[in-house]
Amino acid sequence: MTQAAETELLQRVWDYPLFAALYGRRSRRFGLGFEIAEGPFRYRSRHAALPLDEFEEALLVAAGTGVSGIPLWDGSRPPAVRRGDGRTFGSTAHGRCTALFFTNDRGVFVIDPADVTASKLNEIETRDERQRVLALYRQHRRQLSDGRLAIPRRVPPLFGHNMWNCNMPGTTLFMPVCDVSFTLISLILNLVDGEAGRYVHGHGGGMHIIDDRRGGRAAGTEPWLASGLIDREKVLPLSILERQACYFMFSEPAVICHNIFLATEAMGLGGWMHCGFLSFKVMQALGFRMVGAADQAACANPVGIDGVLEGFCPPYFPSMDAAVDAALVRISHGRASESQPYTMPPSENRDAIPRAPSDAGLACTKAVCRYIHETYGRFPASVDTMHLMWFMQAHHLDPDYYRRFFHSGALGPTHAAHMAAWHGDVAER
């Protein structure tokens, strides 16, 4: 494909109407090289599988997890701890700790631009700046292994109705994995520290975290009740706290997959998102380290992949104190950036930004995290450190299948034109 043709396709995809993508979006599961071996829709593709090229994958990744610009931070005052990069997916509690893994015929890869700081309010404003998506994709794509990820084609790990087409040759399978340990640390800090946190305001009044699985005893907050940092009446059970951390995080991988899904509509690709698999087995195949718990009845906990995506907990840190310190560094990433979303100079709002965090708030946060790990032998206590909930698969459609079995509206104009526009040399064969 020539540079001019690539540029034209990029502009066409970027300008595709949002509502057309929303209302045209369908799960389109049958790709080139696929086969349905039984039933009334029995069909074997007459075409060979055709993998997505680098440009196609770069656009899908840009839609799923691209850096969009500086967050607005548009509250009553600039937050004490904040991220310096906005993404194409929303996040809570200083999150954005979802790494996008994917596999294709060439290998297994991960995209995690965690060290990126946005340079301006809208990172991509002009048509020329749109060209950066391919360079950014190459910059932040890391290959972990050669060859397609070996997900056993059986039940489990796959659910039976997905075995015929999931992770087939020619497909690109996206697998976003989120880190709940980071979010839990951030959430605890916000809930116990009124000065640095956004969920309680002013000095004191922090949540009193109790262990509802151990008779309601204090989960590390006891020393700060007398000082007023923690309010004895604001009781928060640990099990609910950890559930809340999951609620905060679980939107990220779903939105990433849905963004990619909408991009397939604009590009004319097939695919669908699903959770028809056992994540434990898939994460083992990806190479996640599984750590046992103090309670041997509990399943092993996926804590990370060494040097790739590491949880904020042992064994990746010598203690939970060290993990909290590291999480705070990540939470505060981008605070020193000279680029701000405000019209007022930083000197006019600097005094309004509280110290992050207070000494007492940091000490209390560490105490709660130590309590969890020392009591349960894992962090978090009741949920896994890492979660994989969604697959988003993208592939080239076989239009012959849809022409045979479906009405004309089953494929949109982008699907009908995709092969000629994106792969003219293949379409002419």
Feature locations, PLM:
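Acidic, surface-exposed loops and disordered segments
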Residues: 1-429
